């Protein structure tokens, strides 16, 4: 049975998006908004939620390198709470946090290796990071 999954890579000005039907992760898009205006960013998710009707939302969780919870992870927790308040059809059990350490750096390196311009790197970095986060989740289910 296929399962619709969307992944978020949440930043202060962007939300990178990726999708999977349970097997292969694909980058979707990057939502852009004014810095820390998460309400503006979350409202833009509605189109993707209607189109893909996910049963699971995988969220990149930016722990510190020493495995502690820092400012960025607290920001992600805050955005998750806003998401659940805005989209009542979802509950906290459908939100899965995945350790995202180094995914943005890996995404940047992949885009550099692909010889993309800085402009294109900036355009695709967040959705590629979301794809990597989703791939980590899919791999963890195989274990």
UniProtKB/Swiss-Prot annotation:
It holds the Pfam family RuvX. One of its GO terms (molecular function) is nuclease activity. Gene3D superfamilies: YqgF/RNase H-like domain. One of its GO terms (cellular component) is cytosol. It is an enzyme of class 3 (hydrolase). Keywords: Cytoplasm, Hydrolase, Nuclease, Ribosome biogenesis. The keyword Cell wall biogenesis/degradation does not apply. Its main location: cytoplasm. GO terms for biological process: rRNA 5'-end processing. Its EC number is 3.1.-.-. Coiled coil: none annotated. It comes from the Bacteria. CDD domains: YqgF. It is found in: Cytoplasm. InterPro entries: RNaseH-like_sf, YqgF, YqgF/RNaseH-like_dom, YqgF/RNaseH-like_dom_sf. Could be a nuclease involved in processing of the 5'-end of pre-16S rRNA. Belongs to the YqgF nuclease family. This is Putative pre-16S rRNA nuclease. It comes from Mycoplasma capricolum subsp. capricolum (strain California kid / ATCC 27343 / NCTC 10154).
């Amino acid at each position: 049975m296929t399962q619709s999954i969307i992944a978020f890579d949440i930043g202060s000005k962007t939300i990178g998006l990726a999708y999977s039907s349970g097997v292969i992760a694909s980058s979707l898009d990057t939502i852009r908004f004014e810095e820390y205006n998460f309400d503006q960013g979350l409202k833009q998710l509605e189109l993707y939620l209607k189109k893909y009707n996910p049963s699971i939302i995988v969220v990149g969780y930016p722990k510190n390198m020493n495995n502690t919870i820092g400012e960025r992870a607290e920001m992600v927790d805050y955005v998750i709470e806003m998401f659940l308040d805005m989209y009542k059809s979802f509950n906290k059990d459908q939100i899965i946090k995945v350790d995202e350490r180094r995914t943005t750096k890996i995404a940047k390196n992949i885009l550099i290796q692909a010889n993309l311009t800085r402009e294109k790197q900036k355009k695709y970095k967040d959705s590629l990071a979301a794809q990597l986060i989703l791939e980590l989740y899919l791999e963890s289910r195989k274990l």
